[in-house]
Regions:
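Extended, highly charged
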Residues: 1-281, 285-463
Length: 463
């Protein structure tokens, strides 16, 4: 069955088992910053760590799991990482219903602690960046349900561990989990919630599918996984909240009405520290885990966190844009643009089709800049995209700017409390009669490529 440890075993050549003790404060995140700067993306596995209580931990840490786009695509069974958009769109829409297992067949419930014995301090939770107030769960999938329909929702949302049995939880105000939370509180009831941590990357990406409200992520996760996702009733909330049976850790509790606490500042996907906010305070009543659990951490604001969500965005944007622009062939959301840039690629678009597509993509909340190119431009090459912008855009003719569209409250350019923004669409496709691109014959390229393979290039300048 697919789980985190199966993936680590299958890709052991990409896993760096870190030697020696690793501190929970800053060290792993600092290493990930350095690796990002070098464009190197090994999975990091730290086994010699202490928990938040300061004791030697029997729970190890895995991070940088999805920093490599190529490796993440292979986890989905996609041989070419440049072909994820259409694949992701079709697999999440098709979906595969989950299967239900009992506790005896759920590794995540091998160890169960409840009440006073359920301590977050038993986990090796990291403090990532300077000025952050403490240790944060960054790969916890918060799972709630709509009290009206009973339909569940799961999403990655940060949690600041404040004590052994309390943590803040920040559901983005426009998120489906936040809607569920508000519904429970409007009834005067506590919101039941479970946070699951650690699974196969295919499951992680499937649960980041962009769906309507209310709509369960479990079918989408099964679609991406290519098999039914195994679920088990949570210990505290029973069948009202199901959790992945093959996860590593589950934290269960309640977000009571009026129970709030300061949260932040926190390093966001933008690369900047978000300010302090008021967030729900969760009372922890149960923790379940595997006997040799692996704690999964996402490096916030680095490729490790950007790659999987950007892939999910590519699938959603492909579906949105393809509906109005049949000539669309590919979509890319580059990590260099965080989640604010989207690139669209076309084959023989008709009159007005590119502009229709630009406007459709601009309607997606996170996206601020959309660039359209043709098939001869490599979406995944920053050099090629800059070349297209420099040589195929007449700025007075090829740019669409729209004010007052929905944006992200995490966008650092927006004043506090403002949720709308200006967006731009750029048509970098060629007009009729455009000059021919200067090229060399393919057979000559292949011939001289053989010369390169026989030379020692280790000392050649690279910049």
């Amino acid at each position: 069955m697919a789980d985190l440890r199966q993936f680590l075993t299958e890709h052991r050549e990409s896993v760096w088992e870190l030697p020696g003790d690793v501190a929970l404060v800053h060290e792993l995140t600092a290493l990930q910053h350095l690796l990002d700067e070098r464009h190197q993306y090994p999975i990091l596995h730290a086994k010699q760590v202490r928990n938040l209580a300061g004791d030697r931990s029997d729970v190890s840490i895995v991070t940088n799991l999805t920093a490599s786009r190529e490796l993440t695509a292979r986890a989905l069974g996609i041989p070419d990482h440049r072909r994820t958009a259409q694949w992701f769109a079709s697999r999440t829409q098709a979906g595969i219903a989950p299967s239900i297992v009992t506790r005896e067949h759920a590794p995540v419930q091998q160890l169960v602690t409840r009440g006073e014995q359920a301590s977050l301090f038993e986990l090796p939770v990291l403090t990532q960046h300077e000025l952050e107030p403490g240790p944060y769960l960054t790969a916890a999938h918060a799972t709630t349900f709509d009290p009206d329909s009973g339909i569940d929702n799961t999403a990655i949302q940060r949690c600041w561990v404040k004590s052994a049995r309390q943590m803040t939880w920040f559901p983005y105000p426009a998120s489906h989990n936040a809607r569920n939370l508000r519904k429970f509180h409007a009834r005067g009831e506590g919101c039941p919630v479970a946070f699951w941590i650690g699974h196969h990357p295919a499951v992680l990406l499937g649960t980041q599918a962009k769906l309507k409200y209310p709509e369960s992520h479990w079918d989408a996760a099964g679609g991406v996984l290519g098999a039914p996702l195994r679920l088990v009733p949570s210990v505290l909330h029973g069948e009202r909240i199901m959790v992945p049976a093959d996860a590593e850790i589950v934290i269960e509790g309640w977000a009571r009405p009026g129970a709030v606490s300061p949260d932040g500042p926190f390093g966001e996907y933008t690369g900047y520290l978000g300010g302090e906010v008021t967030a729900p305070l969760v009372e922890i009543e149960c923790i379940t885990r595997r006997r040799d659990a692996i704690y999964h951490d996402y490096a916030s604001g680095l490729t490790d966190m950007l790659v999987p969500d950007n892939m999910a965005m590519e699938g959603k944007l492909y579906s949105l844009v393809k509906a109005v622009a049949p000539a669309l062939v590919n979509v890319h959301v580059p990590t260099e643009g965080r989640r604010f840039h989207a690139y669209l690629q076309f084959k023989n678009p008709g009159p007005g089709e590119v502009r229709d597509a630009l406007l459709a993509a601009m309607a997606y909340r996170r996206v601020k800049t959309v660039i359209a190119v043709e098939e001869d431009v490599d979406l995944f090459s920053p050099d090629a995209m800059l070349w297209a912008l420099a040589t195929r855009v007449l700025w007075s003719r090829d740019v669409i700017t729209v004010e007052g569209l929905s944006g992200s409250s995490l966008d650092p350019v927006l004043p506090e409390g403002v949720s709308t923004t200006a967006k731009v669409g750029i048509d970098a496709t060629r007009t009729p009669g455009y000059p021919v691109v200067a090229t060399v014959p393919d057979e000559v390229r292949r011939k001289v490529a053989d010369w390169l393979s026989g030379g020692d290039s280790t000392r050649w300048p690279t910049i």
